[in-house]
Amino acid sequence: MVQVIRIIEAEDHGRERSHAATMPGVTRPEAQLSARHISGVAPGGIEYLWERHSEATTSSVIFPRRRSADVFVELQDDSAAMGWLTDAPGGVLRAVRVGIVETEAEAEAIARETGFSEVDLVSCHIGKVRIWSDFLLHGDGFGRLLVAANGLAPLDLGRLVQRVQELGNYRNMALLGLPMAQEKAREVADAEAAVVDIAERMARGEGDRALLDELSALASRVTSLTAATAFRMSATAAYTSIATDRLAQL
């Protein structure tokens, strides 16, 4: 499976939905431009999934089962599907190739041979399943998640992979608030220092009128700061909650 999550600007929504409905080899009369979910299966068994979220969209391509050695390899027959996946509008927030094999022995061989960074590679068990990732972008611009099913039923395995992907996706969505937090940190520190200064001057008995004017100006600055950050910080809190929930489910 290959999955890409993108941030889409409002003016690109129509173009993006139109692109989503052009899944190669898939005829979906119900894939209307207003749909938030579009999916289909092309001849040869390649599955396509597209879903619109509040701020982002997730596009996924699920390839038919292939040799273990090829789970991260882009084959010639994959070109149309990968073209659909990579040509969509919007800024890429996260792009991951998920390789699924039957056993840990197969997965360990792949981890040695397919460019995982030995220094950064981590692995863990989730029930029967074991997963590996080095959390790096590789030469093709995708991260890699390697999964050994170890006998887990296909439906349960699908749910587990979905939760792992959602954990990573919502974590990255939460991090959209980091640049703003860093940018506004100085303003917050300045406001805190101003409050301390005014309090100290009040204790010394300075003129009430001047202090009142400064407090009014400070309140206005804080109100503007709150308004400028409210949406992004609220979204960050919501995405963090979802990521935490997915982690608890795992």
Predicted regions and their residues:
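Short small/polar-residue motifs
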Residues: 42-47, 128-134, 236
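Alpha-helix initiation and N-capping motif
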Residues: 13-16, 157, 208, 240
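N-terminal pre-transmembrane cytosolic regions of membrane proteins
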Residues: 1-97
